[in-house]
Amino acid sequence: LWEDLSDELKQYPNSLVAYELLNEPVSNDPKNWNRVAALAISAIRAKEADRTIVVGVCTTNSNAMYNELTLPQTHQVLMTFHYYGPYLLTAYGLQSTTGGRTDIPIQYPGQLVPDQYIKELPEAWQSTGQRYYNRESLSQNLMKGITKAKQLNVPVFVGEFGTMKTTPEPSRANWYRDMVDILNENKVPYTSFDYKGAGYSIVGEGQQILYPELVNILTGR
């Protein structure tokens, strides 16, 4: 596949096109992803010695396996990962988190869900709801990926982060503000997910800005 894609895309300069091997690779054994990534990198390098290649971190049981990532070579390779933690907050209101409910109080920073409402969460999320999250806890998690990139001696790019529109607006803004501050502090480039159309969007279908505060946070205004 990547041999064919390289043949098609190599006409475009490196300044315009980079190749991400696979979006959000998932495997019960991260070694599988390391093997596949090495094969793909080798195939691309045989045709394009200097093309920028973006390699994602393998996810196992919803956990990013930063420490398991290996690279066969690091020339013009960039590491990427996505961050949606704590997922109970960022995916608030989904069937998979709150059972589709949006009437259970949730907040950030602080204990995510007040004690008196914990039992209203699906059992799998009750322990998460009892935990305390703030800028420090976000930073600790993000630094796992940032540190791994430093160990590999490659640049790092946070390709996605965001919260659902159903997340209460004050907490949503607080979370975005901390995320952007941490990434800027560590000089890590990033992309917010997403722009419009999906449940995470900040702009409506008619290009209207739905959440001006989030736009200001993301643009540094």
Language model features: what each stretch is:
Residues 3-132, 143-163, 185-188:
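Active-site region of glycoside hydrolase catalytic domains
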Residues 31, 136-139, 170:
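Soluble non-cytosolic domains of exported or imported proteins
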Residues 129, 140, 147, 213-221:
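Aromatic- and carboxylate-lined catalytic core of secreted/periplasmic carbohydrate-active enzymes
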